[in-house]
Amino acid sequence: MAPQASALSQTLESLTLSKIRELEKQRSSYEERKARILADAENHTDLYSRVQTILTGTKTILPNATRDVVVLNIERWLEQHCFDPSVTHEMLQEYETELRSRLDAHSRKLSLADLYSRLLTEWTNADGEEEGDVSEEDYMVVDERQKQRLQQLCDQFEQVVFSPLQTDSGEIHEFFDSFFPDDDKVEALNSLRSDIKSSSLEIFEEEAPFDHSTLTATIKGLLTEDILSEAKQEVLKDFLKNKVALTEIADVLNMRWADLEEWDWFAGEDGIPVLPRQQLNGKYRIWMDEDVLQLIFVQYIGTRLCNLLKMTLKDFIDSRKVWNWDAAPPMTEEDKARYSYYIGSAPVGYGPEATRRSDYIDEYFLSQLPLSLTTLADGGAPYDDDDDSEGDEEANGGWGPADAPVPAAHRQIKQRLLRKIATETLVQRVIYGEAAVVQSDLRWYATGLPHSTIFAVMSYIGFSEKWIGFFRKYLASPLNMDKSSEGRTPVGPQVRQRGVPMAHSSEKFIGELILFFMDLAVNRTTGLLLYRLHDDLWLCGEPEKCAQAWEGMNSFAKVTGLEFNLSKTGSVYLSDAVNPMIESRLPKGPVTFGFLALDPSGAWVIDQDQVDAHVKQLKNQLDKCDSVMAWIRTWNSCIGRFFKNTFGQPAMCFGQRHVDMILAAYKAMQDSLFGNGAGTVTQHLRKMIEARFGVSDIPDALFYYPEELGGLGLRNPAISPFLVRNSLEPSPLKYIADFQQKEMDQYLQLKKNFSELTQAAKTNRYTRFMSDEENRYISRHDRDTFMPFEEWSRFRWSHSSLFFKLYAKLQDVPDAKGIQTTNEVSNALRQVLPNINSLDDEERWIVHMYAPEVLKNYGGVSLVDKKYLPVGVMAMVKEKRVKWQMVL
């Protein structure tokens, strides 16, 4: 830990201990005074005097008693009793019981506050010990097998990056030329090249681009990438706080920029250290440990080129000269003429095709690239394959980044894509008869990219030789792996021959630049959209087109020197009459999103084998937690987020059956972790607390209540699915059946309208919509026969508003149906929360579920008063995210 952080930790620890000691003093004092009050009360033989004694003591020792309406009312009624016999003996007994319950409730609150503080102390002490065991530049291996896997990772990395793979630039250019077969497309390509060249040269020739603003954006962007050691993160954070430092850094980097053509690594005799470092998600990846100023410099360059590429290519594909946006064959002039005659108006584009196009451009196309210099700093553009098990420069066992610093909107991009693929597959299968889905990714993509391919593509798209020359030097980095793993024979720095640095902006720029041409290849040859999140790839549509697209992707990979990861490649062919020729051209293997798999029936099901393996891994992780709070955080990180994401977000395209599968999976997981039907998570935690602290009388609410109300915030995974379960149909086929019925009703109504036209009206319509050239489209016989249903419905994608509604509906997520709020609980919440709407639906469910017990035993809805808790240390330790260890 950095010295400043350590000093802060020690200060907070000292303050925490002081607060805990003060709490213990208050608790002891309260219990002593309470005991004296009750003892004094027992000395009184008459009931009135006893109640009066307890009342006086309550007002003395109970915080806020003088403002407690119930206490004040009892005081008034006791005065009334002296003069009015209507205040009966039984009523006095009730007053006594009420006052005693208030005293006992405060005792329980102080006891829970004491327990809470001890739990926090245990957590912070354990956390400090962990930090002391591992230096900032080291990595942990938990057993010999893990050490071997890490060694294997380093060996594979070394084998790939220092072994050149030469590709043929002429062959690449010729392959790309085939995407531009006519003059219009060549003109568009030349315009693209001109824009890229001029805009990139403007960046290259800028004067003094570094100032406080650009440095702040670049540094903040770096801090979101999880590529820096803790020490270097602290250095960058210190830069952001120091304007003098920013000014000096800007001066140095502007001098480097002025001599950009002569830039080099200048890494010295030892080169750039390369180390495997464990990320928050538990994966080990191979990182270059470059100089901080050099890192800022190249990060800025990469980000600016990302911005340029994204804006330019989005404009490029928006043109129909270049890109095929038709989800189905478009209307011909004959189709339009016939439609106009039979319907009585020209066709209007109300179908989902336009939305599908805008979704692709705005959400999925080049989604890895930041759109501006501040995008990364603002939390935009990052994507990581949450359940990746074999990828670039990494080794893991399948755990995803449950606490990785990725904004919610961008964590959800894969969920939105899942719904998109599920919807289009469902529609294609049910309405059009058959569908196929293809999934793949590229093996060691960023690590193994041939440099010759990079330069060929940069040249083809219009980057000047100045930029290509810069990247020749940048990619040929002198990497030193001598300290990457134990027992390595020192060989000194070696020049990188393949690949780009992981997670840098340059990787985004180069990686997306290369794969843009795969997007283009698929679209130009088949009209399909390649849904791609970096190098994770999905196709869906007609089986023949999917097979053709897969062949085109393989041709692209061959010419560019890329390789598909066969362990993550597969397809599903859904049809009542599978064509063996088409099937043989599709890749073998399953199609999965997280733990959801597309089965041969077309349903998305939870892969229980994967779940079981991860539950076993979770149990190992939980068993290694050395504090109760760490156990809860690990549980929340996995159960509350990781599994929630990998099971897929409930949606209309999955139906209620999917929610029931999620609930069944959670139940099976808890049975596996805590014993089949014999234990629960709260029983397990009670046993932990009793064994460590000797406390057993703990309400369930303490575990599940949110921290704002004095709880530990334990996640109950069943609540989130229950919030939406009743907002879904049992099967998504119900939505399609409803659409088909409405579509047929609409067709029959239009047919009826046409049949009721007089002959004169038909003649008038024919004259109105048919030119001399178009009159051949409708024969004399057809003038009196309404168009067939197949012809009328052929253009759903472009012209059906009903189909648009179905397409949007299937991708919707259901509205949460929260628990009904009672006045009693709402009033209690208002007494302790400045805004009761700050609780989300899940928290409200929990609060109401346990409110009767809490209100009865704790005198309100809050379990522990915040003033008794060491909130500073809570905030500090919560900043440290859960890091998975059992992952190799």
Residue ranges and their predicted role:
Residues 267-278, 425-430, 472-494:
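Active-site-adjacent bridging/hinge elements
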Residues 1-353, 733, 739-888:
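Non-catalytic, polymerase-adjacent accessory regions of viral genome-replication enzymes
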Residues 509-552, 556:
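Active-site palm subdomain of RNA-directed nucleic acid polymerases
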Residues 290-291, 295-440, 444, 841, ...:
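Active-site-proximal segment of RNA-dependent polymerases
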Residues 562, 579-888:
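Active-site and adjacent loop segments of nucleotide-processing enzymes
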Residues 476-487, 570-585:
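Short, conserved secondary-structure transition motifs
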Residues 275-295, 488-510:
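Short, conserved non-catalytic motifs in the polymerase core
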Residues 451-454, 459, 538-558, 606, ...:
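Catalytic palm subdomain of template-directed nucleic-acid polymerases
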